[in-house]
Amino acid sequence: MTILSAITSISRPNKSSKSVISSNGGSSLSMGSNSVSCFNACGGGSSYSYSSSYSGSGLDYSYKANYSSSTGYNSSVIIASSTCHCS
């Protein structure tokens, strides 16, 4: 499976950045790949959260995730595109 990702530069003072992740054939992506993309977009901070939604081919996906250095991951489902909120 080929995973393509593009991370745009931080465009808002509140350190909110956007990460776009896609996969061939709508295959699900691993939590690890998503986390790394958001982690890098946030500059490697100790915590972040992001959410996304995707609609295509009659299927709707949604994904929400939170990461904290003290509690670890809290995540679910599939991600196609996301907005990272850095803290």
Swiss-Prot record:
Residues 14-31 have a biased composition (Low complexity). Disulfide bonds: none annotated. Belongs to the hssA/B family. GO terms for biological process: sorocarp development. It holds the Pfam family Coiled. Residues 1-13 have a biased composition (Polar residues). Residues 1-31 are annotated as: Disordered. This is HssA/B-like protein 58. It comes from Dictyostelium discoideum (Social amoeba).
